[in-house]
Amino acid sequence: VIVTRGIKREYDMGGEIVRALRGIDLAIARNEYVAIMGPSGSGKSTLMNIIGCLDTPNGGEYWLNGQMVSTMSDDQLARVRNKEIGFVFQTFNLLPRATALHNVELPLVYAGMGSDERRRRAKEALAKVQLEDRMDHRPNELSGGQRQRVAIARALVNNPSMLLADEPTGNLDSATSEEIMKVFENLAGSGQTVVMVTHEPDIAAHARRVVVLRDGLISTDDSREAFAARHGL
């Protein structure tokens, strides 16, 4: 799914060059469940933005499903984002007056899909996150974990090749975080490619592979077991 070769990203901050990424070589295969972890300033958010086609690198190549996206125009990137990537953020970004079902349908509304097919696919997505019994509830009638599951269903409804989650448990307590991690594990178990960005080792340890960034470079790239042993988890 993902191959990066020598990815670099620099910013000019008032005349000072900040090197956020200094040469990232990373390959993520279809059906992998990978966490990208690092402290503030490590470059993980910059890498997430590039993987998510929200930003482009200054140097190196980024290939997504055989397409070199690192040199695409903004319009081309937008098309790739809509087709290939489902985003999950720590702020759920749900419409407060819309039901769970309608929130999940929204990307398909923008895609111009007919109402019957939209409804069918939204129900399927809610079933994948075990929330079909709450589809007529509005966000204020749902718990934090249920809201995040609606957001995950919305990210899945377009059948993306990759689910990209940015600090998906950042607004949740530890018990609810475990609930959301189980959702990701179930999705990964059914063949969904999942890439999760986090700064929390105990959350990263739920992934099958953990890539740790430090100072814009890959510091370690471990299996779940090796990462857990390294961090005493």
Task: Give the ranges of each region predicted by the language model.
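ABC family nucleotide-binding domain
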Residues: 1-218
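Conserved beta-strand-loop-alpha-helix hinge in the C-terminal portion
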Residues: 217-233
